[in-house]
Curated annotation (Swiss-Prot):
Keywords: ATP-binding, cAMP biosynthesis, Cytoplasm, Lyase, Nucleotide-binding. It comes from Pasteurella multocida (strain Pm70). Belongs to the adenylyl cyclase class-1 family. It is an enzyme of class 4 (lyase). This is Adenylate cyclase.
Length: 838
């Protein structure tokens, strides 16, 4: 078969030119500056220019300097102004290290906004040394930081075309790099959206091959018959090897991206669902694009906008299945993404080609003026609209995700994503989407920037026929009518969780006027609690790193509120001047505990906000038990432990003693102190013995008619802090102690340990952190992982083939680790499959 490469090149060059014009059209001066200088700064290396790294490999094949770049050089490098003849040779080396530079993604599409990233593929020669690639990586890092000065985000991806074609593009997962999560689907997105900024053209775009699976053999034929020379092209390979195995990892990746870019991920995860519905005859959009481009069938109104092409494909899919509500949500998401950051007062907005095309779509969709106005006012949305939008987003994303999981089950696919990437992705998704008792749901901050309320009213309900017992918050001043109409904003069983929800979602700020209706909590107490919470926890902290996600979700900081909602000290009429510790927990002739409620708020290593509420005579016991169970042996102590007492009486004393108890229990649990010999505590007239075990505290009531001596805990609370002691070695443990450091509730975790004879041990922690041990296993660990993943995907379908008793939830995907024996002990790292990396 013969190909008209000359004609194809003209068409591709025209589209590149059009897309570059559209990328610059309506964009800021800063964006235009960075976009136009990008290739120049990769092509040359000079101390006066951004991105300079000594000995960095530079030079882009077939580079032609633009007038804008030439003027920039003349003003930035003074020596050039005197001798402009140096311009053509202004390069570090005569041999070009870079074969091509391409921008992909939303740039030049209807979804490009002032916040759009420049996702840039830098394809380098495959013979660069490791040292040269590291220098080039440093150069791109410096250019990334340079662009940030203009508020432009660039993500550089160093690409080796030969390595990519061999399915060996599996760099570590990062916030912008999908790692091993998707391969062919990534290439599909690249081909349909790529803009060549400089360098060699993409071979795949120029060859209209009828059977895509024959692409590689057809290229070999063209080379053999000397119709093409591969040195003239960049070739990442064809799209004929799309496997069903990619869908699961790709869906996880899109959910992951949906945390920070929700409306963009809506259309992308739906495209995956659409593709899976066509399997095994999936017709990728990139193939559709190439056929339309090379046969002259491109839509003249948008010249193949990749974002609109996704929308068209998704529209056909949802219409076919009569899912019109989902289609409406997708259209609203597309509109919100395309108009993100748009200033409607800008006189040039009406001349924006993106806005003009949106107007055509709105007419096709028959939208009302009220809906358009509501969407245009997204920046001003408040909590009720944001909650509705957030819940709709989660519902939509999770439905697509579950449909893709069902597809994986149906076709019994083995995920192509590597175990270490699964671990990071699922834990990230677990923190963002999994709803758990006591966990604060953080509304997506990308929906609206300002949720603050002028007034917040908290009211307590008990014994109502209309409302469930608990706490409610409304964004208004006290009004009976508001309650009757059930127009509350949020509900929680505990005040602690409700206040934390309002605070960490930026609804409650320093400028919010607080109101409360409660027989148990005064406005003064509420204000004190809010202030203590605000001063103890910043709303935002540094983003969780992938390294953090490989560790257990250790508590980083916590506050404890004593007697916030139940305060037994209000009933005390006679005040004792001297108080012993035992008196506080078993006070007066009725031996009542003066700790009526304990509320705990903590932030863990994964940046989750969790709350705990304990109420009743044994509140202190339950709080110590549950808190200790969340602290594992050898873990670092929380960076912040604050105890606040809101008691009517004995406020300071209660605070001090609860602080001492919590610190003592945590110190014992992490191994910084030894348990007291007589670890008894008398609470509400009963004697309790504490047993400090590997996974926390257990309690046992001691029944005795004899009067017990002062407890070890009481004595400890009255003495000075002891010097740090070393924990006794545990000789009863039958597994490496380092495993405890990685124990994470909610996940099934597998730890592989190699033996000297070639066999291996497997330590399994279930979702409740119970351990099972399998010793001297043989075979390949990679095959064991595939077996476990298959059981996970099939769990619930075949209960007889489930030896690990796996229960599938949304994001409890099995986690795999390797134990490495080192001189200073055992190190645990995410399992890296040698098969996947080979």
């Amino acid at each position: 078969m013969n190909y008209d490469l000359f004609s194809a090149q003209k068409k591709v060059e025209y589209l590149d030119k059009l897309r570059i014009e559209r990328a610059l059209s309506g964009s800021s001066g800063e964006f235009q500056h960075v976009f136009q200088l990008l290739t120049l700064l990769l092509h040359i290396n000079h101390p006066n220019l951004p991105g300079y790294v000594a000995d960095a490999p530079v030079g882009i094949a077939d580079f032609v300097i633009s007038p804008y770049q030439k003027q920039y050089l003349l003003t930035t490098v003074p020596s050039l102004e005197a001798n402009q003849s140096l311009l053509p040779s202004f390069s570090y080396r005569s041999t070009n290290a870079i074969l091509g530079v391409y921008v992909m993604g939303s740039i030049a599409s209807i979804s490009q906004t002032p916040k759009s990233d420049l996702d840039t593929w830098v394809c380098h020669r495959d013979d660069l040394s490791t040292k040269e690639k590291e220098a080039l990586q440093r150069k791109t890092h410096l250019l990334k930081n340079w662009a940030k000065q203009f508020n432009i985000e660039i993500n550089f991806y160093l690409m080796d075309q030969k390595r990519f074609r061999c399915f060996r593009y599996a760099e570590p997962l990062t916030a912008e790099n999908c790692g091993s999560a998707q391969y062919m689907l990534l290439l599909d997105e690249f081909y349909r959206s790529a803009i060549r900024l400089a360098g060699k053209p993409l071979l795949w775009l120029h060859l209209l091959i009828e059977q895509e699976e024959n692409y590689e053999s057809e290229v070999e034929r063209l080379v053999r018959t000397q119709q093409i020379c591969l040195d003239d092209w960049v070739d990442f390979g064809g799209l004929g090897q799309l496997s069903a195995n990619e869908y699961f990892g790709a869906s996880l990746w899109q959910l992951y991206k949906g945390i920070d870019a929700p409306y963009k991920s809506v259309i992308k995860i739906l495209l995956l669902e659409t593709y899976s519905s066509e399997y095994p005859n999936t017709y990728l959009i990139a193939r559709q694009f190439k056929e339309e481009l090379l046969t002259g069938k491109l839509n003249p109104s948008h010249h193949f906008d990749p974002y609109l092409a996704m929308l068209q494909r998704a529209t056909r899919y949802l219409t076919k299945h009569n899912e019109l509500k989902r289609l409406g949500f997708v259209r609203r998401s597309v509109y919100l993404k395309a108009t993100e950051g748009m200033c409607w007062q800008d006189p040039n907005a009406t001349n924006n080609w993106r806005l003009q095309h949106l107007q055509k779509l709105i007419q096709e969709w028959d939208w009302s003026d009220a809906l358009i106005e509501e969407l245009n006012q997204r920046a001003n949305w408040k909590i009720k609209q944001v909650k509705k939008a957030h819940n709709s987003l989660i519902k939509f994303l999770m439905l697509s995700y579950r449909n893709l999981v069902a597809f994986a089950r149906k076709h019994k696919v083995n995920s192509s994503i590597m175990p270490q990437d699964i671990s990071v992705l699922t834990r990230k998704l677990y923190t963002a989407f999994e709803e758990l008792p006591g966990k604060i749901t953080l509304l997506n901050p990308q929906i609206s920037l300002n949720l603050s309320e002028k007034n917040l009213l908290f009211f307590e309900v008990k014994g109502s026929k209309t409302f469930k017992d608990g706490w409610y918050v409304v964004n208004q001043t006290p009004s009976v009518a508001g309650f009757v109409q059930k127009r509350y904003t949020e509900y929680s069983e505990s005040l602690n969780k409700l206040v934390a929800w309002a605070y960490f979602n930026r609804i409650l700020t320093a400028n919010t006027d607080l109101h409360i209706i409660s027989p148990n909590v005064s406005l003064t107490t509420l204000r004190h609690f809010v202030t203590d919470l605000r001063l103890s926890f910043p709303v935002t902290v540094s983003s969780v790193t992938n390294e953090d996600l490989t560790h257990a979700c250790e508590i980083r900081s916590l506050i404890v509120a004593v007697n916030l909602t139940v305060d037994p000290t209000k009933k005390i009429t006679q005040v004792k001047s001297r108080i012993q510790a035992s008196d506080l927990f078993s006070f007066g002739p009725k031996e009542e505990s003066l700790v009526g409620s304990i509320d705990i708020t903590y932030r863990n290593l994964w940046n989750e906000i969790r709350t705990l509420h304990f109420e009743g005579p044994n509140a202190i016991l339950l709080a110590l038990k549950v808190l200790s169970n969340k602290i594992h042996r050898g873990a670092p102590s929380p960076k912040l432990i604050q105890v606040f007492s809101y008691s009517h009486r004995y406020r300071r004393t209660l605070s001090n003693i609860v602080t001492a108890l919590i610190n003592r229990c945590i110190s014992i649990q992490i191994g910084d102190a030894l348990p007291p010999q007589n670890n008894l505590l008398r609470v509400a007239g009963k004697n309790w013995q504490f047993f400090f075990e590997e996974r926390g505290i257990s309690l046992q009531e001691i029944h005795s008619n004899e009067e017990l001596e002062a407890t070890g805990f009481d004595t400890a609370l009255q003495t000075e802090v002891e010097e740090k002691e070393s924990a006794l070695p545990d000789t009863s443990r039958t597994y490496p102690p380092e495993i405890d450091h990685f124990a994470s509730e909610g996940f099934l975790q597998f730890f592989f340990e190699d033996n000297s004879d070639g066999s291996f041990n497997v330590y399994i922690l279930d979702e409740a952190n119970r351990i099972e041990i399998y010793r001297n296993c043989d075979g390949q660990k990679e095959k064991k992982i595939l077996e476990i993943n298959h059981i996970y995907q099939s769990s619930g379908l075949d209960e007889n083939n489930n030896p690990y008793k796996i229960v599938q939830r949304d994001f409890n995907y099995p986690q795999f680790y390797q134990l490495l024996l080192q001189e200073n002990g055992v190190k645990i790292v995410p399992f890296h499959s040698r098969l996947a990396m080979s």
